[in-house]
């Protein structure tokens, strides 16, 4: 996962849409990820693995390398996987070949200057795009 963050990232849009100067103000501070953020990053990796395996794609199980792995993380990522697979099945009802992209780097700079990020899950069908945003965490440090 990339550590570079977009100035106007989708994940912080609520903040910069309500307070536009906050985007540039944040550049003056070092980006120190909290333990909560590290746990969320690991949960995304586990969720990605579970979805890819369920879609019969190659993936390496990250569980042994996860510092914050817990039964709760396991259950939460199962729920995330199940939701994405349900959406994929629904998409298959209206499209012969839905495209499923997991942890996909996206560039939306056409609409937001220097806009880019990583989409947790994208499901593309004929004339439709479903974007899944997995949230995992307990707090802000």
Segment roles from a protein language model:
Residues 1-124, 128-129:
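Metal-dependent nuclease catalytic cores that hydrolyze phosphodiester bonds in DNA/RNA
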Residues 134-141:
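Short beta-strand-loop-alpha-helix junction that forms the active-site gateway
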